[in-house]
Amino acid sequence: MAFDGLVTKSVVYELNNSLVGGKIDKIFCPSSDEVLIGVYVSGIKYALNINISSANYRINLTTNTKPNPLVASNFCMVLRKYLLNTRISRIYSLGLERVVVIEFEDLDMSDNFTTKKLIVELMGKHSNVILLDDCDIIINSLRHLYTCLLYTSPSPR
């Protein structure tokens, strides 16, 4: 089945109903193009699977866990640094594009709320997962992008 804008909207609707308000308790990257995020919501544990392989790109909830590599990738370590123990505040898609935005909230040292965004671009061989700060500046990405630049979404087709 093709993963188009309508399917993206449906998946985002389901993720929104299941994960908003959930606390991030685990993050690991079983392969170079996959991220698994453990989310704890109302006594239920979910695993959010993000896969950006060119042939099998997707974002979904899963019960299957894969073995965790002994050494975590740089991107995985950055995700853990910024997203562990945060809460999912909102999940949405950009129009009818295959771009999913997951917003996380956390308190900083001075008890102010900070927001981080995880952008999931589901575009075949151009798929990517990008971590942004509260000013939409790129912190890191799964596939190489220049960091410290302002994120701009892909142009609509």
Model-based region annotation:
Residues 2-146:
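Duplex nucleic acid-engaging cores and interfaces of nucleic-acid transaction enzymes
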Residues 151-156:
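Conserved small/polar residues in nucleotide/adenosyl-binding loops
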